[in-house]
């Protein structure tokens, strides 16, 4: 199910749940992509860039579980990308669009 979101609503929701999300090892979480740019379509997912505490030892299972939890909180599909991103072009887009939640 896709729900139309504004950047302000996404960031406010993430900030409301910041303590819970930080317990998963998140150091910072930023919105980027179409929602951040205000170009949301009815089928837009929510693109998030995450920096993790190295002590959290994130693996694919933990990352997937966190992505699902954030999608549940936001009521929309989420694409959660750990930073730094290897593809320079994608990292440039993240940096250009970035709206920091925390």
Which stretches of residues belong to each language-model region?
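A short, structured beta-strand/loop element
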Residues: 42-48
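Catalytic core of pol beta-like nucleotidyltransferases
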Residues: 1-28, 36-42, 53-102
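A structural signal for short, well-ordered beta-strand segments
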Residues: 31, 48-50
């Amino acid at each position: 199910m896709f729900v139309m979101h504004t950047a302000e609503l996404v960031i406010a929701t993430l900030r409301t749940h910041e303590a819970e999300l930080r317990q998963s090892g998140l150091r910072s979480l930023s919105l980027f992509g179409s929602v951040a740019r205000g170009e949301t379509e009815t089928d837009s997912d929510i693109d998030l860039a995450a920096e993790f505490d190295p002590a959290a030892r994130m693996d694919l299972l933990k990352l997937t579980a966190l992505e699902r939890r954030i999608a549940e909180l936001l009521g929309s599909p989420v694409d959660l990308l750990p930073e730094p991103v290897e593809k320079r072009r994608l990292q440039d887009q993240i940096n250009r669009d970035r709206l920091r939640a925390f």
